[in-house]
């Protein structure tokens, strides 16, 4: 099955995240803390914690930092109490945006998110206003040149929902979010290591932006991404370089 070209977009986002490693670590520490608080400190029985720990290790976070975040989550260390909040809104041309936050001050966070939207030509929506345009799923992206037939066989046998070959020949595998860990383990056991693997809100349809509109849309997305309380930004906007 064919799909949109997204390898460049994914690699650009990954490079930008690598350039802000300190901020990435801060976000991951929050995620590990909340995951441990909600599901316990044993990663074998806590898929969310396991995923957060894998991301932290991929980001070269020291093990001591990871363990302290887990201990803080299960009550062994003092620290801020974070709550999860999701905001929804619109960018240029009605592009849908989901902003997932972890915050210890809801009033501060909503003000900052609203300001970012309004400053860059977007606006916040109500709860549920755009979430229906996305599918909650596990997502794996493999580099162009990955053996398509072998990957498809391994993915479907592992419990994946779909395998899509994009226009740039990268391959995308999706699965139910609860099966993410099992599918990831099965794919790696079959010799397939994804460049990107995460549980995401995947847009059901995409809106492409070029030229000045692409620049404006990227500024809005960057403004949201750069907020301290923001963990993830999902959008159906595809910003063409």
Curated annotation (Swiss-Prot):
GO terms for molecular function: DNA binding. GO terms for cellular component: cytosol. The keyword Transcription regulation applies. Its main location: cytoplasm. It is found in: Cytoplasm. The keyword Zinc does not apply. Keywords: Cytoplasm, DNA-binding, Transcription, Transcription regulation. Transmembrane segments: none annotated. One of its GO terms (biological process) is regulation of DNA-templated transcription. Belongs to the TACO1 family. This is Probable transcriptional regulatory protein Rmet_0785.
């Amino acid at each position: 099955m064919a799909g949109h070209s997204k390898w460049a977009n994914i690699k650009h986002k990954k490079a930008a995240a690598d350039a802000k490693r300190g901020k990435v670590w801060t976000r991951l520490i929050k995620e590990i803390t909340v995951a441990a608080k909600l599901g316990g400190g044993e990663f074998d029985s806590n898929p969310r914690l396991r995923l957060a720990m894998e991301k932290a290790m991929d980001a070269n976070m020291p093990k001591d930092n990871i363990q302290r975040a887990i201990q803080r989550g299960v009550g062994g260390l003092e620290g801020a109490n974070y709550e999860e909040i999701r905001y929804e809104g619109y960018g240029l041309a009605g592009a849908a945006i989901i902003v997932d936050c972890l915050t210890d001050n809801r009033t501060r966070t909503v003000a900052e998110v609203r300001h970012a939207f309004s400053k860059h030509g977007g606006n916040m929506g109500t709860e549920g206003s755009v979430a229906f345009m996305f599918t909650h799923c596990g997502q794996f992206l493999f580099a162009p040149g990955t053996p398509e037939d072998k990957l498809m066989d391994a993915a479907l046998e592992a419990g994946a929902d779909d395998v899509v070959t994009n226009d740039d020949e990268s391959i995308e595998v999706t699965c139910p979010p609860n099966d993410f860990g099992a599918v990831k383990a099965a794919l790696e056991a079959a010799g397939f290591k994804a460049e990107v693997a995460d549980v995401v809100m995947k847009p059901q349809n995409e809106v492409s932006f070029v030229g000045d509109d692409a620049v404006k849309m990227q500024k809005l997305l960057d403004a949201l991404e750069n907020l301290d309380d923001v963990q993830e930004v999902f959008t159906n906007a595809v910003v063409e370089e």
